[in-house]
């Protein structure tokens, strides 16, 4: 039974990673999570932007980054420009403003494709976890540790777990698509 918990834990982790990835996909509204992957070289240490200052969303399409150390403003601005978020930062010497323009139809479709790709990657990971779990059970059967019936039962249980998490992934992707396509 311990293997099931292990398999389920891995599947939960995969879904959790997918949620984090989907948070970084911009969907018309400003979301501070899109900055999570951007790091700034702060005294020789790559540091996430959210650890360098206050990030706020004062308006639906604006993110304001107010660093605690004003000297790092230029570095933050440079890293945001180098990133793939597609927003040009406005630096006024005290804060950096990221103004999100309304998404074009073309950009919405690109973001939808990206969300679907993340979903497919997660499904592949789930299926890989399923395959590994079933292979372990088959090896146990081969070694005489479990019976044929136990193997069939285990395969069914693992498949049910897989179906559950694949459905959860589909639901997450569907929600994200609606969010992206919402005008």
UniProtKB/Swiss-Prot annotation:
The keyword Protein biosynthesis applies. One of its GO terms (molecular function) is ribosomal large subunit binding. CDD domains: RRF (cd00520). Keywords: Cytoplasm, Protein biosynthesis. It is found in: Cytoplasm. GO terms for cellular component: cytoplasm. It holds the Pfam family RRF. GO terms for biological process: translational termination. Belongs to the RRF family. Responsible for the release of ribosomes from messenger RNA at the termination of protein biosynthesis. May increase the efficiency of translation by recycling ribosomes from one round of translation to another. This is Ribosome-recycling factor. It comes from Acetivibrio thermocellus (strain ATCC 27405 / DSM 1237 / JCM 9322 / NBRC 103400 / NCIMB 10682 / NRRL B-4536 / VPI 7372) (Clostridium thermocellum). The gene is frr.
């Amino acid at each position: 039974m311990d293997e099931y918990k292990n398999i389920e834990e891995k599947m939960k982790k995969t879904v959790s990673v997918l949620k984090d990835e989907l948070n970084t996909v911009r969907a018309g509204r400003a979301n501070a999570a899109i900055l999570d992957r951007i790091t700034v070289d702060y005294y020789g240490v790559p540091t996430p932007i959210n650890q360098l200052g206050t990030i706020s969303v004062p308006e639906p399409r604006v993110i304001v980054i107010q660093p605690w150390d004003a000297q790092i403003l230029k570095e933050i601005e440079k890293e945001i420009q180098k990133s793939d978020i597609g927003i040009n930062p406005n630096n006024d010497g005290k804060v950096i403003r990221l103004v999100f323009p309304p998404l074009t139809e073309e950009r919405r479709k690109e973001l939808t494709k990206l969300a679907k790709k993340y979903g497919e990657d997660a499904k592949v990971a789930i299926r890989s976890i399923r395959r590994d779990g079933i292979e372990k059970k088959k090896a146990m059967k081969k070694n005489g540790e479990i019976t044929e019936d136990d193997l069939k039962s285990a395969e069914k249980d693992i498949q049910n777990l897989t179906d559950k998490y694949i459905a959860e992934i589909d639901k997450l992707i569907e929600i994200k698509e609606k969010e992206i396509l919402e005008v």
